[in-house]
Design a protein with these regions (language model features):
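An N-terminal domain-cap segment
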Residues: 2-14
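Start-of-helix signal in alpha-solenoid helical-repeat scaffolds, especially tetratricopeptide repeats
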Residues: 17, 21, 84, 152, ...
Length: 353
């Protein structure tokens, strides 16, 4: 729902081979089920191995070039961003496979590698330095904006991948909203600008504040869970988009699961419940201008309202006395199949109906 790759600067001739392969295989999922499209899935393991080997090598080289690592984040060479993007795409592709071995490897080996890279490179702290950007020449401003936004999107994609794995397989999350102190992904019209002149036109039309968004993921989540609430109009993220709300509802889910895993959900439940209510209020306002057909064309973000419903159901069930007896999903931690989640949904969707 917010693209990971910057289309205007992506070049087949110069892109990293692992990124080209990842993009090609991702495209095969959207093709008609021809023999060639289906056979492309045989390359998923190869693409995974290539991307993550190059990520390990590139990260080690960056740390050596930075003096062996020490205080503060390691400088990231441009090529390493492409390797990280490739690894994220392949990680998402492998999550669609039916192999329990691939799922377990995705969760226990590949995801920790992604989270570690985000932390070593300090990506989750990245903010657009608006004052500095506006003093640059147009071409330099565009290049700097794209690089910072790429860092922001890589860290946000990693957080969402972690949330998704945690939710589907009921396992502790690796990343936290606490460390997401950088900027939110920018507005689509900025990311989709085809040139430096088009980017400047968008900034001129919308004002330089369009680069800032007002708050980080951490601040947004803390606002949803705070004791005081001044209503949607005082929410710090402006303008608030549907993809923003998708990130926030995933974060609410992760906060609820983390509280349950730490055996403090009874104390945290009122905080989570009011965050759900406030999120729903924001969603109703943000989505009210869209028809059902328009919302259906918005990718995975269209399911955010359903995720909010699911958060409410999971909170209620988790707080019940027979939570673990009534749900195989809640009984264990770190499942290797989707069956436990599917069984939970079958039971509680039917009860809700």
């Amino acid at each position: 729902d917010f693209p990971l790759l910057h289309r205007a600067s992506f070049a087949v001739e110069t892109a990293a081979p692992e990124l080209l392969l990842a993009v090609l295989l991702c495209g095969s999922l959207y093709m008609p089920p021809t023999d060639s499209a289906l056979s492309a899935r045989n390359l998923f393991d190869l693409a995974e191995e290539l991307a993550f080997r190059r990520l390990a090598v590139g990260l080690a080289a960056a740390e050596r070039a930075d003096g062996g690592g020490g205080e503060g984040p390691v400088s990231c060479p441009p090529r390493l961003y492409e390797t990280l993007q490739a690894a994220l795409i392949v990680h998402a592709l492998q999550s669609t496979m039916r192999s329990s071995t691939a799922r377990r490897r995705n969760r226990t080996v590949r995801l920790p590698a992604l989270v570690s890279a985000v932390r070593v490179l300090g990506l989750a702290k990245t903010k657009h330095a608006v004052a500095d950007l506006m003093m640059m020449a147009p071409e330099a401003r565009w290049a700097q904006f794209v690089q910072a936004e790429t860092r922001i999107r890589i860290s946000t994609w990693t957080l969402l991948s972690d949330c998704q794995q945690s939710g589907v397989f009921h396992c502790p999350q690796l990343m936290t909203t606490l460390e997401m102190t950088g900027s939110l992904p920018c507005l689509p019209e900025l990311w989709n600008a085809a040139s430096h002149s088009e980017l400047d036109q968008v900034i001129c039309a919308s004002g330089r504040d369009c680069l800032v968004r007002g708050a980080s993921i951490r601040v947004a989540v803390e606002t949803l869970m705070a004791e005081n609430w001044d209503g949607p109009e005082a929410f710090p993220v402006k303008p608030l988009t549907l993809p923003d709300l998708q990130v926030l509802v995933f974060s609410i889910h992760s906060s609820m699961r983390n509280a349950r895993f730490a055996s403090i959900l009874p104390a945290a439940a009122p905080v989570v419940a009011r965050a759900i209510d406030r999120w729903q209020e924001l969603w109703d306002l943000a989505a009210r201008g869209l028809t059902a057909e328009e919302l259906s064309r918005r990718g995975l973000v269209r399911h955010s309202g359903e995720l909010c419903w699911l958060a409410r159901v999971m909170l209620d069930v988790s707080m019940s006395e027979d939570a673990e007896r009534s749900s195989a999903y809640l009984q264990g931690v770190a499942h290797d199949s989707l069956e436990e989640l599917h069984a939970f949904l079958r039971v509680y969707c039917s009860l809700d109906d």
